[in-house]
């Protein structure tokens, strides 16, 4: 029999409405496994992940799919998650069409609105991902993730592949959108200095455990 590898153990965290919880730790500490469980890609072998009081591990396939609207993800490498043959107009509106929230005739207008939200020109609708810079692609990722108006945005090393100046502008954008839309953010990162600059609370992970929770601003709201 193979031994069970415990990637995450004894983790007890709350994500608060409109606030950012940072998860920081070195590679291999369990951050990615934790994220996969939060967004229901993996199920925990024990314990619960509660969202509005419901245990996500107990949801049916259909309920899990519907719940994806409430939790959206921004990855480190947008190119890996985009279809290179799709224009930006289709990349941005695909989630809305999949969930039956947009007519095809409304695609371009909605895509332009989403581009404006992330401070990109409207004529980007006709571009392809490879015709854009890394920072621009990450803005497209953010716009796509927020198109469904989720309650929680999960950013997995979302700025680590970007230059420092671009990193700062993307974080400024996320902070602005969080305030405007009152979104909760779970921001996974290996750079403590970066995450301290904007997170309200930071959990430090080491070998699958939360070893320290560093408070940011006072967090008094109720957990979602």
Predicted regions: what they are:
Residues 1-223:
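ABC transporter nucleotide-binding domains
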